[in-house]
Amino acid sequence: MTTVSMRDMLQAGVHFGHQTRYWNPKMKPFIFGARNGVHIINLEHTVPMFNEALAFISNVASKKGKILFVGTKRAASEAIKEAAVSCDQYYVDHRWLGGMLTNWKTVRQSIKRLKELETQSVDGTFDKLTKKEALMRTRELEKLEKSLGGIKNMGGLPDALFVIGADHEHIAIKEANNLGIPVVAVVDTNASPDGVNYIVPGNDDAMRAIRLYTEAAATAAKAGRGQDLAVQAEQDGFVEAE
């Protein structure tokens, strides 16, 4: 089972919250105290809560579930994409478009258009167009890829959301809540934990902390997927030699 230790979290700076004047009182149970005007998060809470979240992620993946990694702020976007790709899951790393989950029918049409343009860009269709028309389609393709590239092969709504920055991604969390999709989210001291099923109290700005979360989540998803493949192999009559 994938787990993260307190030492890992301390080294990554998970315990450093926001300045005390920006705090959200709903995070009080998870705050240890303050140092130099900055809230310190109580890792005695974070460690077991994150490990519980990782067990949940692993369980979702073991049932062939789809996990959507969400992190659109600059500090998180690269790590979110890398983690999702590494475990064959899905991601939104640029901008959350309102209705991405709650208006899936419309999003599906945009994904269809994205795939059409991808095909046209490689099958010679673009070469037959005027320069202006080809440029317009290339720009449309780039725009759609930026927004929907991480979910174009999701094939339906996800079974869980893994979110970096509950405050920044509040629209995504609200949409998931409306649809009954469970949410795992890193919640800093300035954010509200409302609507988050698996709260991970921690720093959501430091690159090292973000990478700790995303890499652990990807490892947990891979471990879960491995369990699924092992069960499948057993059912198919393939048992790995000791």
Curated annotation (Swiss-Prot):
Can you quote a single GO CC term?
A: cytosolic small ribosomal subunit
**KW Ribosomal protein (keyword) present:** yes
GO BP terms: namely: translation
InterPro entries in alphabetical order: Ribosomal_uS2, Ribosomal_uS2_bac/mit/plastid, Ribosomal_uS2_CS, Ribosomal_uS2_flav_dom_sf
Q: Which GO terms describe its molecular function?
A: structural constituent of ribosome
The alphabetized UniProt keywords are: Ribonucleoprotein, Ribosomal protein
List the NCBIfam families. Answer: rpsB_bact (TIGR01011)
Q: Which family does it belong to?
A: Belongs to the universal ribosomal protein uS2 family.
Q: What is the name of the protein in this document?
A: Small ribosomal subunit protein uS2
Which species expresses this protein natively? Answer: Shewanella amazonensis (strain ATCC BAA-1098 / SB2B)
